[in-house]
C-alpha cells in the first residue's frame, strides 16, 4: 500500500500516484512530489517549486518517522510536476496575522518569503 506524508494544503498528482502504483513500488520509495507552489490565492504561482508530499510505505514511515522524512525531503529522489501546494491562503490580512502570530518579523520578510512570483 501507498502511504502519503503530506500537509493538508499539498495535493498530489493523480497521474504520478497511478504511475508509482504501476511500477515496482518498493524499489522507488520514498519519493518526494515536487509541486507547483501558490501563495495567497491561485493567481500567485511561486517560480520555485515545493518539495511537499512524500510517497512511501508504512514500513519506511515506521522506521524513519514522518518528521524525519519531512526533514530529509530535499535529499530524497523526487518527481517533478507532481501536484500543487497552496500556502498562506486567505488574503494578505490573514497572511499578515499568521506571521504576527508566529512572531515573525514581517518588515522585509514578505519579499524574501514570497520570492519571485508570477501573477497568472
What residue ranges belong to the model's regions?
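Conserved catalytic core of nucleotide-sugar-dependent glycosyltransferases
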Residues: 10-112
Amino acid at each position: 500500500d501507498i502511504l502519503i506524508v503530506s500537509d493538508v494544503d499539498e495535493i498530489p498528482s493523480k497521474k504520478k500516484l497511478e504511475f508509482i502504483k504501476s511500477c515496482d513500488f518498493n524499489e522507488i520509495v520514498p519519493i518526494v512530489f515536487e509541486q507547483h507552489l501558490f501563495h495567497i490565492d491561485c493567481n500567485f504561482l511561486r517560480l520555485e517549486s515545493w518539495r511537499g508530499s512524500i510517497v512511501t510505505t508504512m514500513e519506511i514511515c515506521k522506521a524513519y518517522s514522518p518528521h524525519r522524512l519531512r526533514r530529509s525531503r530535499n535529499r530524497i529522489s523526487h518527481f517533478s510536476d507532481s501536484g500543487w501546494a497552496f500556502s498562506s491562503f486567505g488574503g494578505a490580512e490573514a497572511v499578515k496575522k499568521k506571521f504576527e502570530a508566529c512572531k515573525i518579523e514581517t518588515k522585509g520578510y514578505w519579499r524574501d518569503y514570497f520570492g519571485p512570483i508570477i501573477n497568472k
